[in-house]
């Protein structure tokens, strides 16, 4: 005997499974221009003796906008260069800067500096830009993530990517120049290496 209620339940279950599976596959990034950055969240355990939690930030790179910068970031992240590197300069309402293994803001990688690749991409909340000295062609390994719009940087620094997931964790990075208890990158790697 046909039971229409049973059919409705089966269809509902199948629909729910489809939603769950599509959300799970959306989180399974497998793209050479996606980076997975795991960062600490010191302020969640500042008053305890516990290790800080590690949170994931997903970054989309812009090879069509800044091919040399993207290549350098991908090369360094594939080598593990950014692992355990602190956020050494974090200014509320502006940005969080990292990428210097010395933690001073004066260091970089052994790779050559990169020529500027300025574009019309604006610096907005979640934008990743390359840090540099006053010389436009001095970017190397240091980069920053904007907390908010920073239009005064437009055309002055190279935009190479954006945060597409986990911006709430970037917002939670400890402030300071340098912070008393700096957060760090635990791991930064291309999603295809995951």
Model regions and ranges:
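Bacterial N-terminal signal peptides
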Residues: 10-19
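Bacterial N-terminal signal peptides that target proteins for export
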Residues: 1-11
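Cyclophilin-like peptidyl-prolyl cis-trans isomerases
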Residues: 2, 21-194
């Amino acid at each position: 005997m046909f039971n229409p209620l049973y059919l409705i339940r089966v269809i509902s279950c199948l629909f729910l499974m489809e939603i769950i599976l599509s959300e799970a596959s959306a989180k399974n990034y497998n793209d050479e221009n996606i980076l997975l950055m795991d960062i600490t969240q010191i302020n969640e355990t500042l008053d305890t003796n516990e290790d800080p939690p590690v949170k994931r930030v997903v970054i989309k790179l812009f090879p069509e906008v800044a091919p040399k910068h993207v290549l350098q970031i991908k090369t360094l992240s594939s080598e593990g260069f950014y692992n355990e590197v602190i956020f050494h300069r974090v200014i509320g309402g502006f940005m969080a800067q990292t990428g210097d293994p010395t933690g001073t803001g004066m260091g970089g990688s052994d790779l050559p500096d990169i020529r500027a690749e300025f574009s019309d991409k604006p610096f907005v909340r979640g934008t990743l830009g390359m840090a540099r000295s006053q010389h436009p062609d001095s970017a190397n390994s240091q980069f920053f993530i904007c907390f908010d719009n920073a239009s005064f940087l437009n055309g002055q620094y190279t935009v190479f990517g954006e945060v597409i997931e986990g911006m709430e964790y970037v917002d939670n990075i400890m402030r300071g120049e340098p912070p008393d208890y700096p957060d760090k990158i635990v791991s930064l790697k291309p999603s295809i290496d995951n």
